[in-house]
């Protein structure tokens, strides 16, 4: 394990250019804890003490405070307090596997708050040289069903174990005996969903920059103490595990999983990549949508700029301008007549052919059959100066080849305006949901508090309304034209 990395003098312009998948700012960290939100800000802690803070979940910088140094912390909120666990030595550091896991409390994670004060750490797990488990790499789970608190820990140098803690004190429950639940992984995390307990572990080689093969695997169980089986039924206690995420997006060494539930059906996963090739091989904090496929977690894809069809999940129609449909000439062949001449490709309809018939002012939008026409092609572009949200920057959505922008209105409708201005009602939040569809949300709706999303109120009618994950009206897909 190594300390948090910090780099000075990197310009914002450079970081924006590298921001397709990892966070911007200075997101340099190793072994990040599960992300916690406290008083409107986001926090994560890492190996070596300290950690990162973000005002919006997109731009990160140093400043989080965690005493004790050590390695591989985790955090959980219990009531109105935060419990932080971390490891002192162990993990083969300095050639020793003697270590301990400690827990401590704080009322707030904001180091500038007068209430900021960590309690004295309590030892809850330990190991000696020669033991078959390494007391390092803490993972915390507060069971949402019965309120019990669990700690997983361990590395490649033996078993992964689970032990029960007291959620009132953070101490180990007296007489509780650790249970072996996995081998051949480390940096474990426990989560619960829909009647299943999931054990996320980090598999592969660590701490070798661009050569690190770290990847995140998972098994699940009906019982928190196991057995944890992968999708093929292999026990993680015998080396099983299903892949969640590995190297991607020019980054290697995915490790130290964390889950963040934003809303019903909106989940994010955090991890580090041991080497971001676009940032000189630095270890960075990264986020991805967390998808659930047949009861198994898998990392989604970071949304990318481009030109798309925006398709409603309700019926499969596409978002389009309310303009007259202009027919194309040619290409009509009587199917019963023989082909007597070589066939030539048809050219698609181009913007210059139709734009002269469009209004110069605001144009409403509707949903209709997709015909890859200019009034149905939307270019989605990052707006880095507008900030962002957990995982991504805000985007502008314009008709391809124009500055005609999708915008929210004071009466909670959607229109297009002739010119993008950067107004908050023209900025959009795009988030992949756990089923692989997306929700599309304006940064602001003039005169409205709270969040509204783009939805299909009828097969052909888009509007803004309350988000409901259980309704296809709120879901969209992006397809390349």
Predicted regions and their residues:
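Lectin-like carbohydrate-binding module/patch detector with strong preference for beta-trefoil
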Residues: 305-481
